[in-house]
């Protein structure tokens, strides 16, 4: 893995890049409850092949398991030249339209801000994140 780029989906699409050796994993990993905003964690490769995968972690729309169902896969994908993107979506608080809105925006942002990674763009998910991945298939 080369770098990590964090993109806030609702803060004017602000982006911040990190060298992975300087990242405090405690800020990124673990289980997030009541996420107020959507964020993309983009793990770049040393030799990107133009492909990327957006990972939608599970958590039953009550929390997001960023570590076990997200960031833990980054090294494997990036070694294959696949840019790996962990998608932290907002919690719906009973409204399933909220994460669906976020995945729509995430796909748009990835295509517009990172076209070099979008020759082949896939979405996968764990648990309820699998639902979001399936929903996103209707948008690709």
Question: What annotation goes with each model-predicted range?
Answer:
Residues 1-47, 96:
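N-terminal cap/lid segment of alpha/beta-hydrolase-fold proteins
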Residues 50-58:
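Short beta-strand element of the alpha/beta-hydrolase
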Residues 65-66, 72, 87-119:
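Catalytic nucleophile-loop/oxyanion-hole region of alpha/beta-hydrolase
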Residues 105-140:
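Primarily recognizes the serine-hydrolase "nucleophile elbow" in alpha/beta-hydrolase
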């Amino acid at each position: 893995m080369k770098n990590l780029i964090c993109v806030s989906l609702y803060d004017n699409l602000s982006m911040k890049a990190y060298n992975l050796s300087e990242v405090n994993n405690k800020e990124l990993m673990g289980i997030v409850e009541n996420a107020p905003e959507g964020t993309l964690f983009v793990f770049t490769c040393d030799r990107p092949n133009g492909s990327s995968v957006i990972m939608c972690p599970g958590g039953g729309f009550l929390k997001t398991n960023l570590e076990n169902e997200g960031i833990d896969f980054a090294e494997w994908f990036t070694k294959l030249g696949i840019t790996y993107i962990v998608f932290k979506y907002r919690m719906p608080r009973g409204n399933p339209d909220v994460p669906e809105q976020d995945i729509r925006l995430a796909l748009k942002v990835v295509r517009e801000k990172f076209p070099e990674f979008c020759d082949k763009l896939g979405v996968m998910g764990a648990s309820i994140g699998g639902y979001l991945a399936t929903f996103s298939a209707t948008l690709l």
